[in-house]
């Protein structure tokens, strides 16, 4: 059984589309408590803390009975967009989104997604989750943006989609038409590397 330690709807949809059985439980970890400056490492550390936080509180959560059979995997992910060495989270407002898109237009950046899969066994009788393994990796994809006119940028921003996405764009949404190409894992840009997950779920027999 897999638990997605995230409230992300894009990650949820990726797993559903691939028919991977899972349950979704949002992690309550405070992301602002991590001060790591390296963007690559920050994505990985945040993914670990999300999964680890849920693993510590799992005994307080009502889980399906089948959770007692076989290994349990807790998946934490965090995505950060890097543009010319600067971390781009969600834009604070439309003005900031416009400034960022003016810079990104015709350029490229990197979408880093930290992945952590905590493996263990949960015994509902004793309410104990015993961790047997922790697998971590940051997967990076290079994203190339189309050269856009100001009116195109404004039209996109007026949809409000950029305000809810790391980097100010959503590949799976309206913003997808403004992306020229991707080098690396495609699904990683949507918040979860499916090839990485598949390989590790098979390895752990989840």
From Swiss-Prot:
Protein's recorded name: Nucleoside triphosphate pyrophosphatase
Catalytic activity: a ribonucleoside 5'-triphosphate + H2O = a ribonucleoside 5'-phosphate + diphosphate + H(+); a 2'-deoxyribonucleoside 5'-triphosphate + H2O = a 2'-deoxyribonucleoside 5'-phosphate + diphosphate + H(+)
Organism per entry: Prochlorococcus marinus (strain MIT 9312)
EC number(s) on file: 3.6.1.9
Keywords on record: Cytoplasm, Hydrolase, Nucleotide metabolism
One example GO MF annotation: nucleoside triphosphate diphosphatase activity
One of the protein's GO biological processes: nucleotide metabolic process
Top-level EC class: hydrolase
Function: Nucleoside triphosphate pyrophosphatase. May have a dual role in cell division arrest and in preventing the incorporation of modified nucleotides into cellular nucleic acids.
Residues at the catalytic site: 78 (proton acceptor)
């Amino acid at each position: 059984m897999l638990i997605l330690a995230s409230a992300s709807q894009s990650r949820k949809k990726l797993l559903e589309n691939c028919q991977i059985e899972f349950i979704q439980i949002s992690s309550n970890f405070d992301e602002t408590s991590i001060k790591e400056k390296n963007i690559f490492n920050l994505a990985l550390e945040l993914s670990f803390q999300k999964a680890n936080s849920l693993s510590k509180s799992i005994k307080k959560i009502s889980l399906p009975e089948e959770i007692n059979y076989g290994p349990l995997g807790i998946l934490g992910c965090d995505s950060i967009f890097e543009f010319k060495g600067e971390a781009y989270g969600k834009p604070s407002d439309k003005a900031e989104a416009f400034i960022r898109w003016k810079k990104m237009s015709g350029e490229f950046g990197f979408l880093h997604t930290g992945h952590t899969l905590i493996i263990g066994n949960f015994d509902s009788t004793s309410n104990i989750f015993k961790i047997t393994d922790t697998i971590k990796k940051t997967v990076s994809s290079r994203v190339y943006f189309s050269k856009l006119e100001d009116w195109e940028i404004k039209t996109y921003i007026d949809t409000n989609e950029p305000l809810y996405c790391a980097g100010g764009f959503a590949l799976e949404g309206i913003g997808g038409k403004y992306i020229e190409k991707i080098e690396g894992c495609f699904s990683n840009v949507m918040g979860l590397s499916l090839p990485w997950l598949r390989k590790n779920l098979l390895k752990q027999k989840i």
